[in-house]
Regions:
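Accessory, non-ATPase domains that flank or precede helicase/AAA+ motor cores in DNA-metabolism machines
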Residues: 1-307
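ASCE P-loop NTPase motor cores of helicases and related translocases
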Residues: 244, 251, 267-420, 469, ...
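Loop/turn-to-beta-strand initiation segments
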Residues: 367, 417-421, 444-448, 684
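Short basic/glycine-enriched coil/helix segment immediately N-terminal to the Walker B
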Residues: 405-419, 430, 438-445, 649
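Conserved helicase motor core of P-loop NTPases
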Residues: 453-601
Length: 720
């Protein structure tokens, strides 16, 4: 059994539940009557559950004596009163308080023994017929299966908390998978990654140097690199990282990697003297994107009915406005190729160019599609052009998943209906979404990509905009002249100063100010005060003001700031309902954000809304286009959004942006992050933090290289 002390007691209260793991803190009353706080990872117990807990006693500096649990399992009660309470708690499907009372009245302290070993006797109790008995027997058997599998896990020093998930996925084969195919769990079961599967595999006797383990470790390292933005990885770097993770000899890793390549589970590509390793999915996506881009770029100039130069002259005259040379070039070239890139910083006239291109395309009678990666970016595109615009996801039509990858209604077999598509905020496009978008374009459709190449790269894998520009195989128009100097003039000026490595010019009371503080706790409270003040100045519009922080942790991180700001602008009130999910307390009126794409609900990563109703285990959120109900595990998709990370803000604009720059976030402070944060603001930027952090953010350039061969594939000749 699991080593350490064994205690038992009854759960009195759940004190804490982590939002992103199964870490719990709860209080039990030991069998000797003493109260004790238990900490550990496991299946959440119910109030009133009797538990047997393995672990050891600890002393917490703040909270005193605690019991650090390595595992726990539910004990069946052995008194009539305990059994009735246990059954009435909902432990078994189909048994409520009334039936629990009848069962205990019939069988007394023997109730649990009879239920587990002689379930056919339950027919003696009023209200239990053949159908009810069948359902109860199935529920009882499921409980026995969980307990037996949990015991099997614990005999190998693994917490029994995984038992329910394993049985739900594998049924009778769960024990076989544990002993013979443990790494299947990585792809089959949410919440079990390589590290957990590896610990279980080794406990059940997997050879540490065996092919199955090393192969799983190699794939894990590749997937981890994908989450850091890489599409592929040089083989030497992959071998080195895998050897460190697996504590194995590099020569053994290399042998297994070669075997994996031979079987086709991974793909190798030689380029410029290096060998790059891909997952099959990433390799095929990069090939498709390269082919689609080349095919688009190869389209010949559209034969227009309108003289473009005359059209531009007329368009300018009607608006009493003259395009700059590069702006005019962008409009002139917009229909020359099947694919055109228009890039430039804030205030360089990208929106004006897009308006002119739309007017030209409409004059030609073209069917135009407008889209952007996020809801707020699409909304802004619609507002500035006075045309319909959608997120890329909504344009394509979500149709579920294959594994972790999205499916869409529109694809190569069912293309979109359009002659010209304009995609804004393209710096946010990762390889996967680019692939889905390009394959949904009809053969005659032309594409214009608009974005700022100096902003943060996409959260997902790839560097699509950079790679297209770097390939020099697609027409690119760079807008460099700054026009927008009246509204947001200092913001635009400072954005360009920052982008070129210069310190921003600050105006203490104006549109770009810097409030210096070296105390991060005081700084956090200052940010909360500033947020409240700025929101009040707008008449209470919580969506016009946004706090941006580079990281989630520490006093000035997103998590702590959200709690502070919520307390200040939407504090506890008898008139407001509350719901706690994990470590996050929600109230009606809270500003919240969707954290991941949910194709079934039709809400996507970064969408913001307001909580307008809360239940015991449910939340209703009002988004600009719809109301969505969240329940149970779905609540984990939602977070408070008074403060968000800079990455989450991409594609959005706010009247006022409050940016936190503190020393504890130094690892994240880079020029493109600050540049992206500043360019989110339309009217006002408030920097809060230290001069040292500001200087670091301005001077530090992002030296990390994303491994991708898209640019080389577009050039063709550099792939060996």
């Amino acid at each position: 059994m699991v080593e350490g002390e064994v205690i038992s007691g009854t759960v009195e209260r759940l004190l804490f539940e982590a939002p992103d793991s199964d870490y719990l803190v709860f209080r039990i009353r030991r069998d000797d009557g003493a109260l004790l706080t238990v900490t550990g990872n496991g299946v959440k117990p119910l109030q009133g559950d009797r538990l047997e807990i393995r672990g050891h006693g600890t002393i917490h500096k703040k909270y005193g004596a605690q019991f650090a649990a390595s595992s726990w399992k539910r004990l069946l009660p052995d008194t009539a009163e305990g059994i009735e309470n246990f059954l009435a708690s909902g432990a078994f499907d189909g048994i409520g308080p009334a039936l629990a009372k009848r069962l205990v009245t019939a069988f007394g302290a023997e109730t649990m023994k009879i239920m587990m070993n002689e379930p056919e006797r339950l027919k003696e109790v009023e209200g239990i017929g053949p159908k009810k008995l069948t359902a109860l027997t199935a529920s009882l058997q499921a409980e026995k299966d969980v307990n037996e599998l949990a015991l099997l896990l614990e005999t190998h020093y693994i917490s029994g908390r995984y038992a329910k998930r394993l049985l739900a996925e594998y049924g009778d084969e769960a024990a076989y998978v544990l002993e013979h195919e443990p790494y299947r769990m990585i792809r089959d079961i949410d919440g079990i990654g390589f590290n957990t599967a590896d610990r279980i595999a080794l406990a059940f006797g997997t050879d540490p140097t065996g092919t199955e383990r090393l192969s799983a470790g190699i794939e894990y390292v590749l997937q981890e690199m994908t989450s850091n933005g890489h599409v592929c990885l040089p083989d030497d770097e992959l071998v080195e990282k895998a050897a460190n993770v697996l504590k194995a000899e590099p020569v053994h890793i290399r042998d297994v990697l070669n075997e994996t390549l031979i079987t086709g589970h991974l793909v190798a590509e030689d380029c410029s003297g290096l060998t790059y390793i891909y997952t099959v999915d990433a390799y095929e996506r990069e090939l498709r994107v390269a082919d689609d881009i080349r095919n688009l770029a190869a389209k010949t100039s559209l034969k227009t009915h309108v003289n473009i130069n005359e059209f531009i002259d007329r368009w300018q005259t009607e608006r009493e406005f003259t395009l700059a040379d590069k702006q005019r070039e962008a409009v002139e070239r917009s229909l020359d190729s099947g694919l055109t890139v228009i890039t430039g910083g804030p205030g360089t006239g990208k929106t004006t160019v897009v308006k002119a291109i739309i007017a030209l395309a409409e004059q030609e009678g073209l069917n135009i599609l407008l889209c952007a990666p996020t809801g707020r970016a699409a909304k802004r595109l619609a507002e500035t052009t006075q045309r319909k615009a959608k997120t890329i996801h909504r344009l394509l039509g979500p149709a579920g998943y294959v594994g972790e990858h999205p499916l869409f209604d529109h694809n190569r077999d069912n293309p979109l209906e359009g002659d010209l598509i304009i995609v804004d905020e393209v710096s946010m496009l990762d390889l996967e979404l680019t692939d889905c978008l390009l394959e949904a374009l009809p053969g005659h459709c032309r594409c214009i990509l608009v974005g700022d190449a100096d902003q943060l790269a996409s959260v997902g894998a790839g560097a699509v905009l950079h790679d297209i520009i770097r390939s020099e195989t697609v027409p690119v128009v760079r807008l460099e002249t700054i026009f927008r100097q009246q509204e947001g003039g200092l913001i635009v000026t400072n954005a360009h100063r920052i982008n070129h490595g210069g310190m921003p010019v600050v105006d203490k009371e104006g549109e770009f100010c810097f409030i210096e503080t070296n105390d991060e706790d005081k700084g956090a409270h200052l940010v909360a005060d500033l947020y409240e003040k700025e929101v009040m100045s707008t008449g209470g519009d919580i969506f016009s003001v946004q706090v941006l922080s580079p990281m989630y942790r520490n006093a000035c991180g997103v998590d702590a700031l959200n709690q502070l700001i919520q307390k200040q602008v939407n504090g506890a009130d008898d008139a407001k309902a509350e719901l706690k999910n994990g470590n996050i307390l929600f109230r009606t009126g809270d500003k919240v954000m969707q954290k991941q794409n949910d194709y079934e609900k039709g809400v996507f990563n970064g969408d913001m809304g307001t909580v307008f109703a809360l239940g015991n285990d449910s939340m209703h959120v009002r988004y600009p286009e719809q109301d969505i109900r969240y329940k149970g595990n779905d609540l984990g998709e939602i977070s408070l959004a008074y403060a968000i990370t800079v990455h989450k803000s991409q594609g959005s604009e706010y009247d006022t942006v409050i940016i936190v720059l503190v020393n504890s976030h130094s690892i994240m402070l880079q020029r493109n992050l600050l540049y992206t944060a500043v360019t989110r603001a339309k009217k006002k930027v408030i920097l809060v933090g230290t001069k040292a952090a500001l200087q670091r953010a301005v001077r530090a350039t992002d030296k990390s290289k994303r491994y991708t061969l898209l640019a080389q594939r577009l050039k063709r000749d550099e792939i060996c």
